[in-house]
A protein has these predicted regions:
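Residue-level detector of solvent-exposed, low-hydrophobicity positions
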Residues: 30, 65, 93, 155, ...
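Alpha-helical membrane-targeting segments
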Residues: 184, 190-219, 257-259
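Short, solvent-exposed polar/charged micro-motifs at secondary-structure junctions
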Residues: 37-41, 253-259
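Short, surface-exposed, charged/polar-biased interaction segments
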Residues: 77, 131, 198-201, 251
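Rossmann-fold NAD(P)H-dependent dehydrogenase/reductase core
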Residues: 1-191
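C-terminal helical subdomain
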Residues: 206-256
Length: 262
C-alpha cells in the first residue's frame, strides 16, 4: 500500500489482518503522488524489489473536494490523477512485463480510479453576507468543476490512447489498463449541467466526458462495485476490455456493454 497518510494505511492494514489473518503479507510505503521525485524513488524501488506485480490500482486524489496546488504549483487533481499515476505506471511497466511472461500467470492489470464529480463544501466566517457567500460558493464550485473535468478527461483518454493503444498494443504486451469511475448515482455518470448560455472551455471537457460515459462501444456499465469488477472479472480478458472506461451506475437492471476496437 502506497499512501501519503500513514495513520490511514496502518489502520487499514490492521483491519485486513484482523479479517484474513495476522500472517497476511502487507506493507506500507509513504509517497506523495504529487511529488514526482518521491514517485520516482518509491516506484523505482518497488519495481526492483518486487518479484512480480499482478494488480496495481491507482486511486490517489479521488476524494479531493477543493482546489489546491501541489509542490509543482499545478492543480493537485492533475498532479495526482494524471502526472503522478501515469509516471508511476511507467516506472512499474518493466515489472508488469516480467510478470506477464511468467508461465500460467494471469495477465497483469493496472486500474486507474477517476472520481465522480466532487461536492464542494465551503466554510465561511460569520461576518460574510449571504450574497458574498453565494458568490464565493459559485466561484469555488466553478473552479472545482473545471479542474475535475480537465484532469478526469486526461486520465480517461490517457488510459485508452496512451497506455492501451500506444504501449500495450504497439509492444504486444499481455497487460490490461483500465479506467474506472466508482459512482453513487446516475448523475455521476452523466453530464454536468451547463452554467450559462455562453460557450466555455470547460464545456469541451464536459462534452467529452458525457460522450465517453454514454458510448456503448467504449464504456462498460455495471451495477457491481466497478473497481472490484475491473480487478477480478474474467470479462476483462474475454471481451478484451483494454483501455476501457468502466462506470459504476446504480440501476435496477444489470446492463453490460463492452468496448471493441477496429
Amino acid at each position: 500500500m502506497v499512501n501519503v497518510h500513514e495513520k490511514q494505511s496502518t489502520e487499514t492494514i490492521t483491519k485486513i489482518r484482523n479479517e484474513v489473518g495476522l500472517d497476511a503479507t502487507l506493507g506500507y510505503q509513504h509517497c506523495d503522488m504529487t511529488d514526482l521525485i518521491q514517485v520516482q524513488e518509491v516506484f523505482s524501488a518497488l519495481r526492483d524489489e518486487l518479484p512480480r506485480l499482478d494488480l496495481c490500482i491507482f486511486g490517489s486524489g479521488i476524494d479531493q473536494a477543493h482546489f489546491t496546488t501541489d509542490l509543482h504549483c499545478i492543480d493537485a487533481y492533475f498532479g495526482m490523477m494524471w502526472l503522478g499515476h501515469f509516471y508511476a505506471s511507467n516506472l512499474l511497466w518493466p515489472l508488469l512485463r516480467r510478470t506477464s511472461k511468467i508461465p500460467n500467470a494471469p495477465a497483469p492489470r493496472v486500474v486507474f480510479e477517476a472520481s465522480g464529480q466532487q461536492s464542494l463544501q465551503s466554510s465561511f466566517d460569520g461576518s460574510s453576507s449571504d450574497e458574498e457567500i453565494l458568490r464565493r460558493s459559485a466561484y469555488n464550485a466553478e473552479v472545482c468543476s473545471e479542474i475535475f473535468c480537465r484532469s478526469k478527461t486526461s486520465l480517461i483518454l490517457g488510459v485508452r490512447h496512451g497506455l492501451a493503444d500506444r504501449i500495450v498494443k504497439r509492444h504486444h504486451d499481455n497487460i490490461y489498463a483500465l479506467a474506472v469511475q466508482p459512482s453513487r448515482s446516475l448523475a455521476d455518470a452523466g453530464g454536468q449541467s451547463r452554467r450559462d448560455s455562453r460557450w466555455q472551455f470547460s464545456d469541451l471537457c464536459d462534452h467529452v466526458l458525457d460522450t465517453l460515459a454514454k458510448d456503448p462501444y467504449f464504456a462498460v456499465r455495471s451495477s457491481s462495485r466497478i473497481v472490484l469488477y475491473a480487478a477480478t472479472s474474467l470479462d476483462v480478458e474475454k471481451k478484451y476490455l483494454n483501455g476501457a472506461y468502466l462506470v459504476d451506475i446504480v440501476s435496477l437492471s444489470f446492463r453490460l456493454c463492452f468496448c471493441t476496437y477496429c
